[in-house]
């Protein structure tokens, strides 16, 4: 989330509220939960999951997934991608424990893909995108990342067929968090930093 949301949100927030000193760290979801429960962080921006019910969650926006396919991939020739289309192509996937990866693997039924399918595990969406651009396989990218792409890169983007897998991005706080005005400010400013079209889940999207 951070590489694509922070450039849209942080500069304007810092300009409007220079007195607020935000300390930002990137963590996996399991580490976020521990840090919130221990009071080590005040809030977290994560993809909503059923296992986060012990926290307060404010919806920030809904972000759909896209396929990023190299010109040599059979996916590149499709106008939209069905989940069944993904089971015979090499995919670049984040390691287990990243909610971005885990939600898509579940939605697309990739765990049932043939054992002979080549899949690659590294740690960065940006790295995967460079590999796709070099002609190798396909990967998944979040909607906010598409606003940073060049025209050449946009030609590698393919939408999912309906229902489009979409993640709900939320602001998490502990149940005993008392700084209500700060929480509300963060929610409002983050929502203002993303396109209005992402504020609601559409009928063509499916929250995963």
Where are the regions that the model predicts?
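Secondary-structure junction motif
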Residues: 76, 90-111, 179-181, 187-188, ...
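N-terminal hydrophobic or amphipathic helices and topogenic motifs
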Residues: 1-4, 8-11, 15-19, 184, ...
């Amino acid at each position: 989330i951070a590489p694509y949301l922070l450039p849209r949100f942080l500069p304007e927030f810092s300009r409007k509220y220079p007195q607020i000193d935000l300390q930002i760290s990137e963590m996996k979801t399991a580490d976020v939960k521990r840090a919130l429960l221990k009071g080590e962080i005040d809030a977290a921006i994560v993809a909503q999951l059923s296992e986060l019910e012990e926290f307060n969650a404010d919806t920030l926006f809904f972000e759909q997934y896209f396929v990023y396919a190299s010109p040599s991939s059979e996916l590149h020739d499709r106008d939209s991608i069905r989940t069944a289309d993904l089971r015979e192509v090499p995919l670049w996937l984040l390691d287990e424990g990243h909610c971005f990866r885990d939600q898509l693997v579940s939605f697309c039924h990739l765990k049932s893909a043939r054992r002979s399918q080549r899949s690659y595990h590294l740690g960065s969406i940006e790295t995967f995108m460079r590999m796709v651009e070099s002609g190798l396989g396909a990967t998944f990218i979040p909607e906010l990342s598409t606003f940073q792409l060049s025209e050449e890169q946009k030609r590698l983007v393919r939408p999912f067929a309906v229902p489009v897998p979409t993640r709900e991005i939320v602001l998490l706080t502990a149940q005993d968090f008392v700084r209500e005005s700060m929480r509300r400010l963060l929610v409002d400013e983050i929502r203002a930093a993303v396109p209005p079209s992402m504020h609601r889940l559409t009928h063509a999207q499916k929250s995963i």
